[in-house]
Regions:
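Glycine-rich catalytic cores of cysteine/serine-nucleophile enzymes that process amide/ester linkages
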Residues: 29, 34, 72-106, 124, ...
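N-terminal secretory signal peptides and thylakoid transit peptides that target proteins
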Residues: 2-22
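Cleavable N-terminal signal peptides
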Residues: 21-23, 33-34
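Low-complexity, Gly/Ser/Thr/Pro-rich intrinsically disordered linker/tail segments
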Residues: 196-208
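N-terminal capping segments
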Residues: 39-109, 114-119
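...with weaker cross-activation on analogous glycine-rich loops/strands in unrelated enzymes
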Residues: 2, 50-61, 113, 121-188
């Protein structure tokens, strides 16, 4: 097929099209080259691992938390868990009735003994006596408390009479007295009753 010769008007259109195409192509290329690279993702922050001391303390607090709701039993508790209590002078009685001899549970030092023995796999074995537990442990400043540390209490001019376990976040887990259940006390060292009798915190030492 024969095509008619190009007219002057058709020639002008071709020239204009070529000129426009030449101007657009570099602009498209420049835009592609200068596109911003996506921002780099920050490296994930890994939580700091607990020290062996912190890890043991957390296990102690976990064992203590699992005992919440277990009855108080005067003389109750050993390294195997809750045990039958007994009555001794004024201890173990409620309203003149001996509950200790019929209650399986923990008293305050029995709870501390069990939690530390269980959590440490037997590496920490405390006596079943608050004063002995105090002397078997190292002092800890209030600002340095870790879960599992022992909190001791006494009245003015009297020996130590109570021990509880620091649970972290200002709380203590303890076995208080006959007729009660093991419980968690929030803000314990800010409560007048407990703050007024606070005799210091201690951290048990491994055997050996």
């Amino acid at each position: 097929m024969l095509f008619p010769p190009p007219t002057p008007e058709l020639g002008r259109r071709r020239v204009l099209g070529l000129a426009l195409g030449a101007g657009v192509a570099p602009a498209l290329g420049a835009g592609t080259a200068s596109a911003a690279a996506p921002p780099a993702r920050p490296a994930p922050v890994r939580p700091r691992a607990d020290s062996p001391e912190q890890a043991l303390g957390r296990r102690v607090a976990t064992v203590a938390t699992a005992q919440i709701g277990v009855p108080y039993a005067w003389g109750g508790g050993d390294r195997l868990g809750p045990s039958l209590g007994f009555c001794d002078e004024e201890n173990g009685y409620l309203d003149g009735r001996c509950l200790g001899e019929s209650t399986v549970g923990f008293d305050c030092s029995g709870l501390a003994l069990y939690c530390w023995y269980r959590a440490s796999g037997g590496a920490v074995e405390l006596a079943h006596y608050t004063v002995a537990q105090y002397h078997r442990s190292a002092p800890v400043a209030r600002a340095d408390l870790l879960p599992g540390d022992l909190l001791f209490f006494s009245r003015p001019g009297a020996p130590l009479h109570h021990v509880g376990l620091w649970a972290g976040d200002g709380a203590m887990i303890h076995a208080e007295r006959t007729g009660t259940l093991i419980a968690r006390v929030e803000g314990v060292l800010d409560l007048p009753r407990w703050a007024g009798e606070f005799a210091g915190a201690r951290r048990p030492l491994p055997v050996g």
